[in-house]
């Protein structure tokens, strides 16, 4: 399943607020569909699937990528769910979003893909790069790149930069100063249900 490129508000009407996907709120309260979806008791599978979809759409990863992250999270010490969230939070496109360089994760991914972002002084155009403690994320030294980011950083997608990131706003740089704790994840998600969803599939 490839990355979603359709209407974003349709997704948030179904899954709820996804801060990484869009800053807009739908004026419609009913779920998508001709008449909305009939209210009925959802199965445990449907609930787990919905939580998994929240992760996919918020962070903008494909099903194949998410499976890889789940496998990697399992192989690490500690809680698989927390490890999974940490891996997604450490993606370069997400770090740029959390620093305010882009208004959304898709917007931040575009900055990375178009060569506007540097890691430790070198241009890096890999959105899924896993940022490490000590990495310095910056903006390429040219007018066009800086202008793009200066407009975003004045009105960031999220109000606060999480404590594991240090933002130097005048220099348009950010530094990773540690691990992302669970409570600093902006998405409202039950990651344990995601782990359960993949328990028999991966």
Swiss-Prot record:
This protein's UniProt keywords: Ribonucleoprotein, Ribosomal protein, RNA-binding, rRNA-binding
Domain S4 RNA-binding, first and last residues per copy: 90-152
Function: One of the primary rRNA binding proteins, it binds directly to 16S rRNA where it nucleates assembly of the body of the 30S subunit. With S5 and S12 plays an important role in translational accuracy.
Subunit details: Part of the 30S ribosomal subunit. Contacts protein S5. The interaction surface between S4 and S5 is involved in control of translational fidelity.
Record family assignment: Belongs to the universal ribosomal protein uS4 family.
Protein name as catalogued: Small ribosomal subunit protein uS4
SUPFAM superfamilies for this protein: Alpha-L RNA-binding motif (SSF55174)
Region (Disordered): 1-42
Cellular component GO terms held in the UniProt record: small ribosomal subunit
Biased composition (Basic residues): 1-13
Protein's organism: Prochlorococcus marinus (strain MIT 9301)
Alphabetical list of InterPro entries matching this protein: Ribosomal_uS4, Ribosomal_uS4_bac-type, Ribosomal_uS4_CS, Ribosomal_uS4_N, S4_RNA-bd, S4_RNA-bd_sf
GO molecular function list: rRNA binding; structural constituent of ribosome
Biological process terms in GO annotation: ribosomal small subunit biogenesis; translation
């Amino acid at each position: 399943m490839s990355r979603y490129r359709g209407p974003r508000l349709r997704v948030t009407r179904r899954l709820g607020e996804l801060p990484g996907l869009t800053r807009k709120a739908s004026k419609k309260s009913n779920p998508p569909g001709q008449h909305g979806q009939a209210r009925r008791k959802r199965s445990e599978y449907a609930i787990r699937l919905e939580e998994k979809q929240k992760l996919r759409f918020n962070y903008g990863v494909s099903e194949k990528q998410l499976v890889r992250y789940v496998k990697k999270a399992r192989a690490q010490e500690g809680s698989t769910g927390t490890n999974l969230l940490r891996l997604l939070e450490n993606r370069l496109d997400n770090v740029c979003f959390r620093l305010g360089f882009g208004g959304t994760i898709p917007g931040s991914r575009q900055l990375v893909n178009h060569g506007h972002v540097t890691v430790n002084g070198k241009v890096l155009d890999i959105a899924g790069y896993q940022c490490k403690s000590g990495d310095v994320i910056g903006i390429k030294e040219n007018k066009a790149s800086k202008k793009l980011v200066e407009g975003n950083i004045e009105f960031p997608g999220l109000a606060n930069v999480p404590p594991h990131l240090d933002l130097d706003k005048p220099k348009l740089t950010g530094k990773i100063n540690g691990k992302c704790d669970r409570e600093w994840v902006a998405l409202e998600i039950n990651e344990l249900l995601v782990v359960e969803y993949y328990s028999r599939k991966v």
